[in-house]
Amino acid sequence: MPKKFQGENTKSAAARARRAEAKAAADAKKQKELEDAYWKDDDKHVMRKEQRKEEKEKRRLDQLERKKETQRLLEEEDSKLKGGKAPRVATSSKVTRAQIEDTLRRDHQLREAPDTAEKAKSHLEVPLEENVNRRVLEEGSVEARTIEDAIAVLSVAEEAADRHPERRMRAAFTAFEEAQLPRLKQENPNMRLSQLKQLLKKEWLRSPDNPMNQRAVPFNAPK
């Protein structure tokens, strides 16, 4: 009998080799895809980080530019109020509506401000009030011989004075202004004279020194 062939089948070996090669190629491809995905994801994180950094820097520069523009407007406005010429600075022509309205309002206030050279009248220019006590005595209505009579004379004099508080209004307001205006100037150094006088007027309306705030006797009250 002829001997059996003991060697390896060439076709089977070739098939196994092809399968092993295909498997190795598939594994290599899969590994490459995994690596590419990893590096791609890492690149995304880097790009996002750089983008956030750029946006933060841009916001910082914008904020700094706004601060510079605000400072320039304040300096220009101060120069106008002091009567000097505003510095010419080459800037953007964009001006907000609020800035325009604020400038117009300030110019209007400067035009409407009263002449600061006007001085309040002194006590020498105000006519002297009549001595009511002397007039009452001279008319002979009451003669103070005792303490009771003196009290009665003073009461009559106070009533006569309170019948017309407006007669003392001008002199009282002048005295009030001379006494309180320096205090208001010291407490409000940035206010103009017109604003100080408005504030003084409000205090005058509530002041006990105002004759109109004192007890006024009706004009037709019985004597």
From Swiss-Prot:
Q: Which residues carry this modification: Phosphoserine?
A: S141, S194
Keyword terms of this UniProt record? Cell cycle, Cell division, Coiled coil, Cytoplasm, Cytoskeleton, Phosphoprotein
This protein's record includes keyword Transmembrane helix? no
Keyword hit for Ligase: no
Composition bias type Basic and acidic residues, residue spans: 18-74, 99-126
Q: In which tissues is it expressed?
A: Ubiquitously expressed.
Q: Which GO terms describe its biological process?
A: cell division; transcription by RNA polymerase II
Question: Which region ranges are annotated with the description Disordered?
Answer: 1-126, 204-223
Give the residues annotated as coiled coil.
15-82
Q: What is its main location?
A: cytoplasm
Q: Where is it located?
A: Cytoplasm, Cytoskeleton, Microtubule organizing center, Centrosome; Midbody
Supply one GO molecular-function term.
RNA binding
For this record, an example GO cellular component is: centrosome
InterPro entries attached to this UniProt entry: Ccdc124/Oxs1, Ccdc124/Oxs1_C
Quaternary context: Associates with translationally inactive ribosomes in the nonrotated state. Interacts with RASGEF1B.
- Record family assignment: Belongs to the CCDC124 family.
Describe the function of this protein. Ribosome-binding protein involved in ribosome hibernation: associates with translationally inactive ribosomes and stabilizes the nonrotated conformation of the 80S ribosome, thereby promoting ribosome preservation and storage. Also required for proper progression of late cytokinetic stages.
Indicate what this protein is called per its UniProt record: Coiled-coil domain-containing protein 124
Q: Which gene encodes it?
A: CCDC124
